[in-house]
Regions:
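Catalytic cores and adjacent flexible loops of soluble metabolic enzymes
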Residues: 2-302
């Protein structure tokens, strides 16, 4: 399979629920809740409400089968947290069960916002599939997991693949495994928080040209401007972590946006979309009175 040239997906876009995601479509904004719910279903609902109020198109969670993703040795390591004294206590404490996701599903439906998850193992894909999500996310950490890629693709749902900490050769291979149909790639840098000099936003148009599929941006920086710049450079969707308070306990809060920040990102992206235009230079009707008032004409000197 050639990696170059436009595909049907890049021309038509990728359908996620009731939204078409791709070039010439409004940027699809994903609020990454991830594990910022801190294991509290009520906090998860508050974050969903924040995303709705900001105007986001979707919220995303993370799902892991802990004993599959982590070794017994890793889980036994000492680590203090509100859930206990080991790394395993922490990991298990941050996972929601089936009944929690039933609440999440019902709350998102009532709030009229899409939800899906990045699944870190095949059992988690099967678990989330019970809720019939509109798509799946594959995290940068899983880009080289061919079994997970194939299992996720087998659901028949669109796949959003993050490409942080990955070489072009590794991305090439992942695209070969997944196929280009109903695939969206996200440019990303996997440091938390990411430095601006690590963001390399010019990779977005390069990836669009190389792979011929819609390309978006997953940001882990602390500011807002670079996410808006990603949209200007052609990102078909953007993803940012959200939190109620960046000072909260937890590993991802510091690289997340608080409610006001998320609202500003969505607002600014929509304003930029209005501002881009079609590239045809024209004189607008509202400029006509200004022409009459200020336009200077060449007056010959006798």
């Amino acid at each position: 399979m050639s990696l170059n040239g436009a595909t049907n997906s890049s021309r038509r876009g990728v359908q996620i629920g009731n939204r078409l995601v791709g070039d010439s479509e409004p940027c699809y904004v994903i609020a990454e809740i991830g594990i910022n719910h801190n294991g509290d279903i009520d906090q998860a609902k508050r974050l969903i409400s924040v995303a709705v109020a900001a105007g986001c198109d979707a919220v995303k969670f993370q799902k892991r089968t802990i004993d599959v993703v982590y070794s017994a040795e890793e889980l036994a390591k000492p680590r203090e947290s509100p859930f206990g004294t080991t790394n395993g206590d922490l990991k298990h404490g941050l996972e929601f069960d089936y009944y929690d996701y039933q609440e999440i599903d019902a709350y998102c439906r009532a709030s009229k916002i899409a939800w899906f998850a990045s699944c870190w193992d095949e059992m988690s894909v099967d678990f989330i599939e019970r809720f019939n999500p509109p798509c799946y996310k594959v995290a940068s950490a899983s880009l080289t997991d061919d079994h997970l890629l194939r299992h996720t693709r087998a659901t028949g749902k669109p796949v959003i693949l993050s490409t942080g900490m990955s070489t072009l050769d590794q991305i090439d291979h992942a695209v070969e495994v997944l196929g280009k149909e109903n695939l969206i790639l996200l440019h990303a840098c996997s440091t938390y928080p990411a430095y601006y000099e690590e963001l390399n936003l010019r990779a977005i148009p390069v990836m669009k040209s190389r792979y011929g599929v819609p390309v978006g941006y997953s940001g882990h920086e602390t500011g807002l401007a670079s996410t808006v710049a990603a949209a200007v450079l052609g990102a078909c969707c953007v993803e940012r972590h959200i939190t109620l308070d960046r000072s909260m306990w937890g590993s991802d809060h510091a690289a997340s946006l608080e409610p006001n920040g998320m609202s500003r990102v969505v607002r600014d992206i929509r304003l930029v979309e209005q501002s881009m235009g079609d590239g045809v230079k024209r004189v607008y009707e509202r400029e006509q009175p200004i022409i009459k008032k200020l336009r200077r004409v060449d007056i010959a000197v006798k």
